[in-house]
């Protein structure tokens, strides 16, 4: 998310493409311009990221949608992770402080798995009605 200089441009089209194929999960990441020359990339606005989370959840309601570890740190990460919980994403790699509290506050069950978000060995896709937030 945010690959076009921090802007959201092709993400809705990418979700269209992904939604046409039978896949168990989608792992979303947010551009992190740490190693780019200053000014080359901008960090995407958290509200844009949140809108993509909602759209991904809506379009892929029968599949797992996960937030990978690649995302900007600090306040951006805390806000992004809050949006991920509230949008109904199924997992967050290395959740920010407060993400579990948000899940608990809004009544989303959660559990912790010690695995990479892109490797779900032995895990069957969860039905839409029993979504949990893996922290």
Label each residue range with its predicted role:
Residues 13-135:
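Auxiliary Fe-S-binding modules of radical SAM enzymes
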Residues 2-13:
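Canonical radical SAM enzyme core domain
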């Amino acid at each position: 998310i945010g690959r076009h200089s921090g802007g959201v441009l092709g993400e809705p089209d990418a979700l269209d493409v992904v939604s046409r194929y039978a896949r168990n999960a989608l792992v979303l990441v947010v551009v992190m311009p740490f190693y780019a020359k200053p000014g080359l990339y901008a960090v995407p606005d958290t509200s844009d990221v949140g809108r993509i989370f909602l759209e991904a959840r809506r379009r892929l309601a029968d599949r797992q949608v996960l937030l990978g570890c690649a995302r900007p740190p600090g306040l951006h990460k805390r806000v992004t992770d809050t949006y991920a919980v509230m949008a109904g994403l199924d997992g967050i790699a290395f959740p920010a402080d407060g993400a579990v509290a948000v899940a608990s506050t809004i009544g989303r069950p959660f559990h912790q798995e010690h695995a990479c978000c892109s490797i779900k060995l032995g895990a069957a896709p969860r039905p839409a009605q029993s979504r949990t937030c893996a922290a």
